[in-house]
Amino acid sequence: IYLKSYIHGFFIFSMLINPVDLLLWTFRRNENDVVKLYDALSPIMEVSTGGDMLNFGFWDETTLHPVDAQKRLCEMMGDMAQISSAEIIADIGSGILGPAKIWNSQYPSLQISSVNVNFSQLASVEPSNISKLNSTARMLPFSNSSLDRVIALESAQHFKPIGDFFSESNRVLKDDGILALAIPTATENSNLSNLGILKF
């Protein structure tokens, strides 16, 4: 299958994706399948949106561009997770750190650890004051009761079994800590053209 991104009147990117791989991604068996999926699709998603986030975002009638929807979702997650009152957070399944960069710019004193099973995504990001940890969501690399917030922004749907992630989040969160999740959904009346980065 050839995928092309159409931005500002130009075809920017063309890539061959094996249809068998596409089918196998639908029936992910383990974390390596998710890594392969994002290794193949991340460049397309970045070029298609012009941004550094890999989420669908939050769309409404006023949303005009995928990057606007993505930024809006990050800000909403930050508000819902109450990161303004947090000191130490972990962004699990962090991709290429787009959301963490937004939160870091809004809250410079916030200590952010980005946890991702995909080493190549972490390695592709320029060094910053955001900690990058290559680890699975099933065994979080934090001590007991050490985090104020655990955030999984459109990543928890990949954590298999998700119960392990919930147990680990409970272990690493302080007693008053918050686990915040955003999982992509579509309503029956969703317009497929608004899927932005994944409308192929």
Language-model region placement:
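Conserved class I S-adenosyl-L-methionine
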Residues: 178-200
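A short glycine-rich, Lys/Arg-flanked "PGG" loop and its adjoining helix->strand segment in the class I
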Residues: 163-178
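A short SAM/SAH-binding and catalytic strip from SAM-dependent methyltransferases
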Residues: 149-161
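Conserved alpha-helix/loop element of class I SAM-dependent methyltransferases that forms part
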Residues: 64-85
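Class I SAM-dependent methyltransferase SAM/SAH-binding core
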Residues: 88-139
